[in-house]
Amino acid sequence: IALLMASSLPIGMQANNIIESGDTSRVYDIDEVVVIDQPKEAFRLRQQPLSSTSFNGDLIRSLNVQDVRNLSVFVPSFSMPEYGSRYTSSIYMRGIGSRVYSPAVGIYVDGMPILSKSAFNFHTYDVDRVDVLHGPQGTLYGMNTEGGLIRLYSRNPFQYQGTDVKLSIGTKLHRQIEASHYEKLNDKMAFSVAGFYGGQNGFFRNQYDGSHADLINEFGGKGRFLWRPTDRLNFDFIADYQYTRQNGFPYGQVVTEDELSSATITSPLYGLKAGTQSPNQNRQGNYRRNIINTGLGIKYAGNGFDINSMTSWQFLRDYMLMDIDYRPQDFMHLTQRQLGNTLTEELSIKSRNNSKWHWTFGAFGSYQWLKTTAPVYFDQDMNSYLSKKITDYAYNGMLNAMAKGMAQRLIAGGMSEELANKTARVSTAAAIAAAGGVNINMTMDP
């Protein structure tokens, strides 16, 4: 028995040695590695004391994320509501957000800050990673980041080469095509080009004319060129253009049970069902937008430090038409045109070493020029309504003033007060009618 025990020991040790040296039948899972540049942070995102959510390229494609709004389904405490067009792009994070004017959540695309809130809602494609940083990020990213920050990174042609084509079709004639090409010319130069077209007939119809109330068509193109003349110096040029044309603001009237129960047979509510009604507008709201975002990133790797510079120019030109009475009657409508240019320059310098102490500092400057015209038009039904109100007011004023004087004279002549007032009003009304009456037609200019 002792012999058997002694002989079994080296056999077991030999088996353990085989496993430790390497088992060819064992399968090792290695997560996808995405290499991105962090010009401001000295530590990896997972090592930083903040709450964040990250998506790699495969996850973005599997979730079918088409724009930033789609992320609100998967990111906690993050919301980007749908207001009916790409114009309105309010972002809320942890309950902090801005409905108008300056945003409270910032967006960076390949290191380029997007400052115009009217350009936040754009089609995302060619994206390799998305980081959502929760909470204030003003220390490193400055203004408009009180609620948080969203960073998007495009696929790097130095790391990925090839041609990708994506075709999709869905309900309500959703259609989309995306094509991109990535090529590495040599060890120092690489480029990528991409383009897309997307559209959908929409889910709502305008009851006034039967048109699609949320029809959308959009297209765009993107180019990127990377140049590494030396081991220390890198250049990254990005240009992105997108055009959107959509029927927007498919708003319908909300009708309650109480309103229906009190509606008469002549009421426009008679025969409707409680809830939100289909859009019914005599003017179909629409939105058109051109945006161009260009940026030049420069990075220099020194001895123990990195210098990063991002210079960008952003262009916005859009047009919006909204039937602001949301009714089949022609009361009021709004048109708005925006023309904006934005220049930004961001410079950051950070340490690059293995010591316990890391430092970073920088500067940011921007110039934003925006011209907005937004006249409100009073249309035919509104002008007719106001004309009638003013005409009635003027007519009654004249009638009462003239009849009062005539009645006083009749009473002084011995007529009773009741008969005098009645006679005076009849006579005055006849006199006004004989003179042509009172007719005021007004037109309200914006």
For each feature predicted by the language model, list its residue ranges.
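Face-selective signature of the C-terminal outer-membrane beta-barrel domain
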Residues: 289-316, 338-446
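N-terminal plug
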Residues: 24-25, 36-50, 57-84, 100-102, ...
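Cleavable N-terminal targeting peptides that direct proteins into the secretory/outer-membrane pathway or into
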Residues: 1-22
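Outer-membrane beta-barrel architecture
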Residues: 70, 92-94, 151, 180, ...
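Outer-membrane beta-barrel translocator/receptor signature
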Residues: 89, 103, 116, 125-128, ...
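Periplasmic-side early beta-strands and strand-to-turn transitions of outer-membrane beta-barrels
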Residues: 159-160, 168, 184-283, 316-331, ...
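Coil residues (strongly favoring Ser/Thr
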Residues: 23-24, 32, 416
